[in-house]
Amino acid sequence: MVEKKNLRIVYMGTPDFAVEALRCLVEGGYNVVGVITMPDKPAGRGHKLQFSPVKQYALEHNLPLLQPEKLKDEAFVEALRAWKADLQIVVAFRMLPEVVWNMPRLGTFNLHASLLPQYRGAAPINWAVINGDTETGITTFFLKHEIDTGEVIQQVRVPIADTDNVGIVHDKLMLLGGRLVVETVDAILAGTVKSIPQEEMAVVGELRPAPKIFKDTCRIDWNRPVKRIYDFVRGLSPYPAAWTELVQPGGESVVVKIFETEKIGESHQLVPGTLQTDGKTYIRVAAEDGFVGIRSLQLPGKKKLKTDELLRGFRLTEGCVMK
């Protein structure tokens, strides 16, 4: 058995979700010989270059770093080869070309935030909550050509509460993911891995995809049932946030982001999207089979507020519609 201090690991990742597993490896005494993350991006009003969370961690811990624009670039491939990795680990990064993932002698594994083969794609946590699932999980799997299809190494299941939003589920999976990455490395070191092809895994129901989420994806359809809208808002909160168009009786409209709702099972004959409010404490919107109570929302250029806070400074009247 190879000792962990002699196993040369290259780690690839970009956002906060990827920092936890890197931290677990470094603090656990594993030999991370290099880190690969996205190039710096301009952000904010001053367009200052912003480091990715993984880069920030790597710099703080003096880890060698590469930030390639193109993963097939010869200079990058040679620099990666010079690190002589035995194993590569990928968490929330990019799709890798074969020349990269096939390089280490022990292969490359990925941490994916779903119970594969469910929710292959870029936004698995969002879609699990949007679809009202009561359970999700994390998976480690070996990379192969098609995205998120490689043989599964290990999985951990995680319950989703009816009150959880995507931020809460993200943080649960992030913490468990760090531990699962370490357990997967240990299993590879011990030679005890028995990976399973995804097509041989038992799946309940149909396979659901997890495509990238765009602005248009986040628009609320008030013609849907209350439960579906409630789950939709949870699955996009706090980021990127569900939104709707608030149309005043005079015709002027603003885009409103909605972060928290409640289900109100009260029948009505109203057109979906019809807004009701007392102007002080509550806003509720007609849906297909009841009302959606709005608990937390944000107007353009303003901060996120509870409904009663917003109504103190923003006049809403009967006759408003959400579209």
Stretch-by-stretch model annotation:
Residues 2-46:
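N-terminal Rossmann-like dinucleotide-binding module
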Residues 7, 28, 38, 87-212, ...:
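Donor/substrate-binding cores of folate-linked one-carbon enzymes
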Residues 14-17, 69-72, 92-95, 264:
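Short beta->alpha connector loops
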Residues 31, 64, 135:
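Residue-level detector of anion-binding/catalytic polar loops
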Residues 42-86:
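N-terminal glycine-/serine-/threonine-rich beta1-alpha1-beta2 phosphate-ribose binding loop
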Residues 202-323:
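Internal anion-binding site segments
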